[in-house]
């Protein structure tokens, strides 16, 4: 691939961050498989401060479709159990006195379809964000061209580079979506 312009590199960097955000959000989507990423947004009351669970405990994937949460301070067992049970994820946490265990039930076919629909919406939002980056960066190129800093041909070349980067990132977003869709439907 030919060396990219600074305009294209800037667009590429912003689009890369958008894709990373999309992947991070998909990690939080509940499939039937146990994952610790789902618990990143659940906060527990830690001495009066809402604190993410992963900052007060060790999370690990256990056997039999469970996540095991081992708090560093045993006093946190009950608040962790309470935070998980009151979350909107539909999990049931069990405190055995040493650790909190969270079972991941198999989602029904209907739940799986709803999850796929939700991640499809996330994909579309990601594509819109990518296109907005393209629009903003092409607008910058046109402004610079109008100032006379670059020629018409250079501006056209930069716009084509930015469009190519958009296509690459939209294709990558589709691949990420398809992997997650497959994971949901097969779990």
Curated annotation (Swiss-Prot):
InterPro entries: Ribosome_recyc_fac, Ribosome_recyc_fac_dom, RRF_sf
GO BP of this protein: translational termination
Keyword Nucleotide-binding on entry: no
Entry-linked Gene3D superfamilies: 3.30.1360.40, Ribosome-recycling factor
GO cellular component, one term: cytoplasm
Keywords: Cytoplasm, Protein biosynthesis
Subcellular location per the Swiss-Prot or TrEMBL entry: Cytoplasm
Highest taxon above the source species: Bacteria
MF GO annotations: ribosomal large subunit binding
Family indicated by similarity: Belongs to the RRF family.
Function: Responsible for the release of ribosomes from messenger RNA at the termination of protein biosynthesis. May increase the efficiency of translation by recycling ribosomes from one round of translation to another.
Descriptive protein name: Ribosome-recycling factor
Organism (species): Petrotoga mobilis (strain DSM 10674 / SJ95)
């Amino acid at each position: 691939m030919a060396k990219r312009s600074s305009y294209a590199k800037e667009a590429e960097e912003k689009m890369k961050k958008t894709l990373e955000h999309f992947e991070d959000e998909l990690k939080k989507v509940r499939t039937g498989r146990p994952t610790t990423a789902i618990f990143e947004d659940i906060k527990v009351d830690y001495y009066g401060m809402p604190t993410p669970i992963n900052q007060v405990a060790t999370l690990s994937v256990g056997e039999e479709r469970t996540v095991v949460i081992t708090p560093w301070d045993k006093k946190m067992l009950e608040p962790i159990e309470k935070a998980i049970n009151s979350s909107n994820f539909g999990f049931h946490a069990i405190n055995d006195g040493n650790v909190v265990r969270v079972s991941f039930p198999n989602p029904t076919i209907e739940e799986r379809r709803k999850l796929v629909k939700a991640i499809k919406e996330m994909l579309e939002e990601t594509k819109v964000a990518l296109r907005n980056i393209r629009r903003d960066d092409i607008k910058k190129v046109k402004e610079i061209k109008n100032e006379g800093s670059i020629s018409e041909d250079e501006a056209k070349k930069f716009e084509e580079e930015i469009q190519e980067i958009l296509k690459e990132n939209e294709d990558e977003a589709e691949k990420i979506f398809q992997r997650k869709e497959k994971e949901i439907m097969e779990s």
